[in-house]
């Protein structure tokens, strides 16, 4: 009983720390966006956002799936210091070489495409995120469940970035300063990562076996490419087909949704190292118990969020960004239905397949999502702008969730009781009626 309590307490602490970390990662762009919306023009905000979107493609490619794969491997090796050092060193050097390669490709792209050359300073600034990706070893700390360090480190650098933003960005001509500050917090985190890592691991140069990681990494590279296509293609196509103001409307709307989604995903992210460990130790009962509790938590938190957003999104957008971004409210309303579906798909599909070493099955789900979202965006964006992107992304996410859950179904057994589900439904029905009546009165 005592051991179980300690485990629950540990997961609770990790959840709180990781919630702070992930919400802050999204609150920082939100808060900085609030300030920027009142200082910079939608055109320049759109340019900065679009450049971030482009560099993100290269960051994901350079990572080779290591953020996901590394958590599992570090978690499995954490009881053996020698093996832990070896796994860390192998993955670090793979990421090092890959990042340098894709950094070269990124600079070739900037020099080759005229629209990028016109904003070359902006793209060079954003390219720093790719360069310092060499030192992004969050997967080490997540695999070791060192969420307190991750969270506190993030608070410090995000706070510094916000102070710099208010101090230096004063008018529309300061959009390059805005871009620099957007990168400062992230790069600072990476540098502290590598310095602090000496407490847990030593970088080895001898007797390394890179080959043993290649098969899983190649699968995850394919998965990550597909994921990034269906998660980044909306902004990319909006930037291609529409004026940059439309990009800003969509990004500001989806950003609030992503903050709420991060809250929903936090618990599932935190338990991945624990689930991986339990699965490797063949502790099926504990494995299924934690999964069941996670699904119940998703339902308890997600459904009220969806209902609340339907009645408050207009006020939220006006309060945060001002009246000129009111069209972003419709984006939040539509995408909010994913606040339950996406975390369930992530947990019962993507994470389960990774933990059980079935990475190759993940390709099926994300490839379908990438194809459907690309086609959907191509058709809908030209006619419906930001709402076309929102519709396409929502439908693609639903498709991915269904495929994920289907593929992962045989590796776990949920113990959801009918009475518990009825209570959740009834409580949310009461909330829906209350908000509807309140809205009618207003």
List the predicted regions and their residue ranges.
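Interhelical loop/hinge segments that connect adjacent transmembrane helices in multipass membrane
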Residues: 1-7, 11, 148-151, 175-182, ...
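Interfacial segments at transmembrane-helix termini and the short loops linking adjacent helices
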Residues: 109-126, 309-341
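Interfacial/gating helices of multi-pass transporter permease domains
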Residues: 32-58, 175, 212-220, 238-258, ...
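Signature of the first transmembrane helix
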Residues: 10-68, 103, 162, 182, ...
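Helix-loop junctions and terminal segments of transmembrane helices
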Residues: 33-34, 63-79, 253, 257-295, ...
């Amino acid at each position: 009983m005592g051991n179980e309590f300690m485990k629950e307490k540990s997961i609770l602490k990790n959840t709180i720390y990781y919630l702070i970390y992930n919400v802050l990662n999204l609150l920082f762009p939100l808060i900085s966006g609030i300030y920027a919306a009142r200082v910079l023009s939608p055109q320049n905000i759109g340019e900065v956002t679009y450049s971030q979107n482009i560099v993100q493609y290269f960051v994901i490619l350079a990572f080779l799936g290591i953020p996901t794969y590394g958590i599992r491997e570090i978690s499995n090796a954490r009881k053996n210091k020698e093996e832990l050092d070896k796994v860390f060193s192998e993955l670090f050097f793979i990421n090092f070489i890959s990042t340098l390669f894709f950094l070269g490709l990124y600079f070739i792209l900037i020099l080759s495409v005229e629209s990028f050359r016109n904003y070359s300073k902006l793209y060079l600034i954003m390219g720093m995120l790719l360069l310092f990706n060499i030192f992004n070893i969050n997967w080490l700390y997540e695999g070791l469940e060192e969420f307190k360090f991750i969270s506190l480190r993030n608070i410090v650098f995000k706070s510094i970035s916000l102070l710099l933003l208010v101090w230096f960005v004063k008018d529309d001509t300061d959009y390059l300063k805005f871009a620099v500050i957007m990168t400062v917090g992230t790069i600072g985190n990476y540098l502290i990562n590598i310095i602090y890592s000496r407490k847990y691991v030593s970088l080895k140069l001898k007797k390394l076996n890179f080959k043993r990681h290649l098969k899983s990494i190649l699968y995850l590279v394919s998965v990550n490419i597909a994921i990034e296509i269906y998660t980044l293609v909306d902004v990319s196509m909006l930037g291609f087909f529409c004026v940059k103001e439309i990009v800003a409307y969509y990004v500001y709307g989806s950003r609030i949704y992503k903050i709420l989604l991060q809250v929903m995903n936090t618990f599932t992210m935190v338990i991945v190292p624990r689930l991986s460990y339990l699965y490797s130790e063949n502790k099926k009962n504990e494995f299924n118990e934690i999964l069941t509790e996670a699904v119940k938590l998703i339902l308890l938190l997600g459904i009220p969020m969806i209902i609340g957003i339907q009645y408050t999104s207009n006020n939220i957008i006006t309060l945060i960004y001002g009246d000129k971004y009111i069209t972003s409210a419709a984006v939040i309303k539509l995408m909010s239905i994913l606040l339950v579906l996406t975390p369930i798909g992530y947990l019962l599909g993507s994470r389960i397949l990774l933990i059980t070493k079935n990475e190759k099955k993940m390709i099926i789900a994300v490839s379908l999502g990438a194809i459907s979202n690309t086609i959907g965006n191509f058709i809908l964006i030209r006619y419906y702008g930001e709402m076309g992107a929102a519709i396409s992304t929502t439908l693609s996410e639903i498709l991915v969730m269904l495929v994920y859950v289907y593929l992962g179904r045989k590796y776990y057994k949920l113990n959801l009781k009918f009475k518990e589900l009825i209570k959740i439904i009834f409580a949310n029905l009461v909330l829906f009626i209350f908000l509807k009546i309140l809205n009618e009165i207003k």
